[in-house]
Amino acid sequence: GCITGMSFYILLSFLFKLDSFFCILTLIIKTKNIDENKSMMEQIENKDILLSYPFESMTSFINLLKEVAHNENVASIKMTLYRVAKNSQVVEALIDAAEHGKEVVVMVELRARFDEQNNIEWSRRMEDAGCRIIYGIDHTKVHSKICLITYTKDNKVKHISQIGTGNYNEKTSKLYTDLSLMTANEEIAKEVGKVFNKICMEEVMEKTKHLLVSPKCMQNKIADLIDGEIKKVEEGKTGYIGMKFNSLTDKVLIEKLIEASQKGVKIDLVIRGICCLIAGVKEYTENVTVKSIVGRYLEHSRIYIFGTEDDRKIYISSADLMTRNTVRRVEVAAPIYDENIKKRVSKMFDIMLQDNIKGRYMKSDGKYYRPEIAEGETLIDSQEYFFEEAYGKIE
């Protein structure tokens, strides 16, 4: 029989690299606002740094690990690993650090689906090099993406934390959209340290002030943040919620979002995959928009926004709003405190909402439709926009 439609493209995918069908977008190596010739540690001490993959390279984070491995003032590195590349520079840097006398503690999740064998092999190599390997918590997957560096400077103990939305994987950092925050904020470092300590004791966080940490301190805190926006509306102010993740199935949070919509909170959701909330239903979700973006790169970053520009709380997270993530895994969401980074993430979210090329909107029938484009309206492909921005073509 003849080959038609999707079958044709699936067949082609086995014959050619998919890159053959795309124009070449050279991945940027140097990141704006980062000086590759200066110490990454000092630059992070000076100000928080946010990397946006694949539009910016993971090289800056790898350079941080390499610097830390050889810095005599560094005492320890702690990291959670879920999926890593076959030839991981990240793991090689951790091995290098251990061989240079640093205390290296690595939580390796052996239940990462399809990566079990790779993780076992890397675990053995790291153990042989002197790293302390922890294999997680019974019945609770560790899916968080966190790294904590402890060092001394001016006779004081200091820390650098890295918290991300995606894996420490150089290969997927070129294929998935993700965010990575590096900060010297000691309050955040204190809580990241507690997360590691709890994992080592096979326990979970019961209380946090800055981070959102599942399975005990995320779902309820997100519900509280939603309640905060409802309260604003009840006081005659503007309530707003903007969220981006891969899937939405958490019934508790779906019901909270419906309640917020009914009270008049404006809600924008960018959800690539499964969404168990139907937008635009009269008297229920009239104030909710749901958009899916499927482009050249896999949308993978998770962003939580609460409030308008004057009073806005922003988090980046490893967690989708699925019950498996919010109550059955260890996930970490980090607040963005740097005002410039808050503006940047807000702008990124706004550009995604404006995407009228790769974006599709859900209507009240639960189906997705192309946006109607008015004559003369600017065409926006959010992923292409972010690439051009990274190259300095867009200010």
Which ranges hold each PLM region?
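N-terminal localization/anchoring segments of enzymes in phospholipid and broader phosphate metabolism
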Residues: G1-I241, E259-K263, C275-E395
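NTP/phosphate- and nucleic-acid-binding module
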Residues: D250
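Hydrophobic alpha/beta core scaffold segments
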Residues: K266-V270
